[in-house]
Amino acid sequence: LTEVLQNLGKDQYPQQSLEQIGTRIAKVLEKNQTSWVLSSMAALYWRVKGQGKKAIDCLRQALHYAPHQMKDVPLISLANILHNAKLWNDAVIVATMAVEIAPHFAVNHFTLGNVYVAMEEFEKALVWYESTLKLQPEFVPAKNRIQTIQCHLMLKKGRRAP
């Protein structure tokens, strides 16, 4: 996430520290408080800084102002925060909302797979990783996670065999 933040505006600005980026986002957000994009960027900044509560506040604002067809962006960010907080059922609900809004976006499917892995619901995770690959066949992290889960399930099955 830090790299994503630092790459924002890299064509217009020299390499900047996280604090400089955060300050720049805050100044622009003061001028345009209804920008869901800026609120989402601010949430990303707070996630990088480890301030989940502040990130959620920014995402609430982003959800309020985002057009319906773009609400998956702040929703999937919120799902990741909930996932990291081990609020997996909430993360599933929010990530599912993101998939319903943007079913063509592979990252939404991948996020659901990640949450199901955390819940140790490996079969459900496989379904979501496979749907990720249907949307984006070269998505290497999804391929790697499928292999890892399949290996885990085979080992688990082997332990149960008489």
Kindly give the residue locations of the regions a language model identified:
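Canonical positions in the second alpha-helix
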Residues: 27-28, 61-65, 97-98, 131-132
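Short coil turns that delineate tetratricopeptide repeat
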Residues: 33, 67-69, 103, 137
